[in-house]
Amino acid sequence: MSKTLTYLFDPLCGWCYGASPAVASIVESTGVGLELLPTGLFAGHGARPMDMSLASHAWTNDQRIEELTGQIFSLTYRDQVLCNLHQPMDSTAATLALTAVAQTQPQREFEALQRIQRARYVDGCNITELHSLCELLRGLGLWDAAERLQAAAPELHAATNQRIDRACTLMNELSARGVPGFVIQDDGEQRLLPSSMLFSQPMHFARQVCGISQAELDNLL
């Protein structure tokens, strides 16, 4: 299958975390290629200091996501991440980490994203700091990526900015709003898929990805 599903995301986006199991299932069952593009929603100038208002808003949304998807947002995460006003809502380091993985073992970038998400939302770890992310990458055996992240060379920052710029350009071209966003690319043509469908009608979303009938999808599954 020559199709590619481009996944527009931010590592600190709760809805992106909620979408992860469905994305993994669709990629595994259909064989569609997966390309990750970070949008920089909470990176760089998009980063925000944490305060109680933001923490409360995030936790309320997180509970909705957990109810809808079954993804865990632990009390440890609430207490150690959201209630830690010294820990900003800043995905800069996590986005750099994923670019380092994309440069060294691109086939494992989605796996690394899932592990970063779990570290934050389940384990309550601080994934806004480079040293924590370096340890996380080493724990996955992504030694080259960890080395690149630790060096934090200008080239890594430039590559990350290029990915963010590409994501933003794609979003503007297709009038995409927010993350997660999904673009199916097939033989030079690209089409924005409704991300809400992934949560409400995942099987129909899979059909949209494949461009096939329900009966054909059933045979794949």
Put a short name on every predicted segment.
Residues 17-121, 220:
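Structural alpha/beta surface segment adjacent to cysteine/selenocysteine redox centers
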Residues 9:
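Short metal-coordination and nucleic-acid-contact micro-motifs, chiefly zinc-binding Cys/His arrays
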Residues 12, 20-26, 115-221:
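C-terminal cap of thioredoxin/glutaredoxin-like
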Residues 1-6:
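Extreme N-terminal starter segment of soluble prokaryotic enzymes
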